[in-house]
Regions:
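Helix-loop-strand module that forms the ligand-binding subsite of alpha/beta enzymes
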Residues: 76-157
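A generic structural motif
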Residues: 53-59, 158-160
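N-terminal beta1-alpha1 ligand-phosphate binding loop
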Residues: 24-55
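Short, Lys/Arg-enriched N-terminal segments with co-localized hydrophobic residues
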Residues: 8-22
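N-terminal beta-loop-helix "entrance" segment that forms/cooperates
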Residues: 63-80
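Secondary-structure boundary/capping motif
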Residues: 37-40, 69, 104-105, 141-142
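Glycine-rich phosphate/pyrophosphate-binding loop and the adjoining helix
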Residues: 23-24, 29, 159-211
Length: 211
């Protein structure tokens, strides 16, 4: 990955262990790419929050109050957008939980990402560990949306969790409103997903200044 210290003795030349050991406490922000009151992806996000391992806290970074982005705002950023970018800065990593609309991400999520990237040169996702997950009734739930989203995050220079991929097939009653997961296999997958993302966060916990 560009900018990281290199070591020819490890695969791909990337030396992660120089960034410090596992963090004892992590705060992970999550963005739900839907503003629907009945969103199953919001229930998935609540499940992740409920399943967070010891020492990890998940907090929502809301997007519903962001206005439509326009370059006209760059000279005078609205406070809601300032707060949104600060919320991203304040967490150790971000999980984006996205539905799939018309084989891509919802407009409300794209709008939030545009705010995060502006003004030019002040991208809130630069070197921010990020993970993508989503659920739908399909066996490859939200796969097309996630590919588009990962392309955006790559442009943002955001280290993004590669494996496991978060394609969760939703069935009636799988997620309760409070985040309860009724299927043990799904709960186990989500727990492993959070652990893998925690490992990614740890690798970037002490990236040298200026990287």
């Amino acid at each position: 990955m560009p900018g990281l210290p290199l070591d020819s003795t490890v695969p791909n030349g990337i030396r992660f262990d120089s960034f410090g050991g596992p963090m004892t406490n992590r705060t992970i922000g999550y963005i739900v790419g839907s503003i629907s009151s009945t969103s199953i992806n919001r229930r998935l996000a609540k499940a992740l929050e409920r399943l967070a391992p010891e020492g990890t806290t998940l907090v929502e970074i809301p997007i519903k109050d962001l206005p439509f982005y326009s370059v006209d705002h760059d000279a005078d950023f609205p406070q809601v957008a300032v707060d949104f970018k600060q919320a991203i800065a304040d967490v150790n990593g971000v999980i984006i939980v996205t539905p799939e609309y018309s084989r891509s991400i919802p407009g409300v999520l794209k709008n939030a990402l545009d705010w995060a990237a502006r003004p030019y040169g002040q991208n809130a996702f630069n070197l921010k560990p990020t993970a993508v997950i989503g659920t739908s009734g399909s066996g490859i739930g939200t796969a097309a949306a996630q590919q588009h989203l990962k392309a955006i995050l790559s442009h943002f220079n955001a280290p993004t969790l590669g494996q496991p991929e978060g394609y969760v097939q939703s069935t009636p009653g799988l997620f309760g409103e409070d985040g309860e997961v009724t299927n043990d296999e799904t709960a186990g997958f989500l727990t492993g997903y959070l652990e893998a993302f925690g490992d990614l966060i740890d690798r970037y916990a002490e990236v040298p200044a200026g990287v």
